[in-house]
Design a protein with these regions (language model features):
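Acidic/glycine-rich beta-solenoid
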Residues: 1-246
């Protein structure tokens, strides 16, 4: 099959360390076929990806390149990822991370300029707080597009570490579990009114078999083979109509 970029065959190149360095595609056009680089990779001396170049418009002579640059801290944790459109020089997407001594992410700043609509673009910072057991207890999201408006979400847990509540100040979601610590219900409330309840069922092997949504009346059912591999998903709506995904 041929992709929308005209690529109908791929070849892979590796360096002496066995690290993937290039993906090449055979591009079919009216003038015949030519081999072009679809993506290239460079690494640091430890094998961590430093840079990826994606070549987007392979059918035209002036390939559109997106360069993805990755930087790491002294503990080899990703510190920053930047995706730049080399045709315009504009940073299209970027992520910056900070960590605590346990390598939990404490702050993430995200910029996403890919959406065409300004309202859909992203420029925000999210701060994460953890308890002594390393469980996430709070996130604070600062929206830099909207006068640094903030949104806080808090999380609570039971004594065995199951999340029992999520609260964003407007909506509260409570979680209950069965004796095997499998999620049994998720109840979403707005104010004092119940907005939605999801009910979960499992088979004797612990596979999730059903998810029922009381708000929509929809039930998702999951079937497994003898080796507990998912083999079928079916969705039944409130009118009893079933769609099967195999």
């Amino acid at each position: 099959p041929t992709t929308k970029n005209g690529v109908h065959a791929l070849a892979y190149e590796y360096d002496q360390n066995g690290w993937l360095t290039k993906i090449k595609g055979e591009v079919q056009s009216g003038d015949g076929s030519t081999e072009k680089t679809v993506r290239s990779y460079t690494y640091d001396s430890y094998g961590k990806v430093k840079e990826i170049k994606d070549y987007r418009d392979l059918l035209n002579s002036s390939d559109q390149e997106v360069k993805k640059v990755y930087t790491y801290d002294s503990l080899d944790r990703v510190k920053e990822m930047t995706y730049t459109d080399l045709e315009t020089g504009k940073v299209m997407e970027s992520y910056r991370y900070s960590y605590d001594k346990n390598s939990n992410i404490t702050e993430k700043t995200e910029v996403n300029n890919y959406p065409k609509e300004e309202k859909d673009k992203v420029n925000e910072t999210k701060a994460y707080t953890y308890d002594a057991l390393g469980r996430l207890t709070k996130t604070v999201t600062t929206d830099h597009k909207n006068d640094d408006e903030t949104k806080t979400v808090t999380y609570t847990y039971d004594k065995v570490g199951n999340r029992t509540k999520e609260d964003d100040g407007t909506t509260q979601t409570a979680y209950t579990y069965n004796g095997l610590d499998q999620l049994q219900t998720a109840t979403k409330e707005k104010g004092t009114a119940v907005d939605e309840v999801r009910q979960y069922s499992y088979d004797a092997n612990g596979n999730q078999t059903d998810v029922k949504n009381t708000k929509t009346g929809q039930t998702e059912s999951y079937t497994y083979d003898a080796e507990n591999r998912l083999s079928k998903v079916s969705v039944t709506d409130k009118d009893g109509k079933t769609a099967v995904i195999q």
